[in-house]
């Protein structure tokens, strides 16, 4: 699933292509998404057709496309979703579900093979429950003191804590594994026991995310930016997907364990419990 760096990469590559553009028409595939209640074609048409895009931004793992009218569209990429821009004449990929036809014969396309993503039009996107429920953004809305307080109030395992979007917005499995390794914190450490390392952990989270953004995201299979280019961050991963390989910081081996169906990668020498 695209995490904060991947979503930020999509946003940054969308902006120069669609901001200032007007939407001429809208097309939908007619196929249902798994979150079908979100894809209200009538509401999308009413909100989007004739609208001028004035901003594209990220909130957690969500993409918000703002219109000059104050309304907009909220997009979640789910597991395999993509937002790309292409010429009208270019053949559409299989599993294209929504197309916004722009001026200058360009199209903004939402593609999602597994259909876990969704698109929702809203008169006030920032007031949607999904957005209001998000915790602070770790890059722009968090400091050591605030993280310390959040950690102190939780007995959940630190990895579970960091994945909770109500506590911090945007982190996912890849970048949590990487950040915990950088902070030298075992993934099963209870959150409140890590509060003394709040500043170190915040620095590790921010460094991990900034590297991911600089490398345009992590692409194992599906992720591409709005131009169709894959990310390069896989080359910068320290522990994620490196089970059995030698730790880059010591002579130990990277290990994998499974919690709640998710693989967790860590070094038991560097990250002692």
PLM regions and their residue ranges:
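Structured catalytic/nucleic-acid-binding cores of DNA maintenance enzymes
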Residues: 1-273
């Amino acid at each position: 699933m695209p995490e904060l760096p991947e979503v930020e990469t999509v946003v940054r590559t969308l902006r120069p292509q669609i901001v200032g553009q007007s939407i001429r028409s809208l097309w939908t595939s007619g196929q249902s998404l798994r979150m079908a209640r979100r894809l209200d074609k009538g509401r999308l048409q009413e909100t989007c057709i004739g609208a001028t895009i004035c901003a594209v931004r990220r909130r957690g793992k969500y993409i918000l496309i703002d219109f000059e009218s104050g309304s907009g569209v909220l997009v979640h990429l789910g597991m395999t979703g993509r937002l790309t821009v292409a010429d009208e004449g270019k053949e559409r990929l299989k599993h294209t579900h929504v197309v916004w036809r722009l001026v200058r014969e360009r199209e903004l396309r939402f593609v999602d093979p597994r259909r876990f993503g969704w698109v929702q039009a809203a008169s006030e996107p920032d007031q949607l429950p999904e957005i209001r429920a998000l915790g602070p953004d770790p890059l722009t809305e968090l400091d050591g003191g605030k993280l310390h307080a959040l950690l102190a109030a939780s007995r959940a395992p630190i990895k579970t804590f960091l994945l909770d979007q109500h506590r911090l917005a945007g982190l996912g499995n890849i970048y949590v594994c990487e950040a915990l390794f950088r902070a030298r914190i075992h993934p099963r450490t209870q959150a409140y026991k890590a509060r003394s390392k709040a500043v170190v952990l915040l620095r590790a989270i921010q460094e991990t995310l900034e590297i991911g953004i600089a490398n345009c995201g992590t692409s194992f299979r599906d992720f591409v930016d709005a131009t169709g280019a894959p990310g390069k961050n896989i080359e910068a991963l320290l522990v994620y997907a490196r089970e059995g390989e030698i730790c880059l910081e010591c002579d130990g081996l990277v290990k994998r364990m499974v919690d709640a169906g998710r693989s967790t990668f860590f070094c038991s020498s560097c990250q002692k419990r």
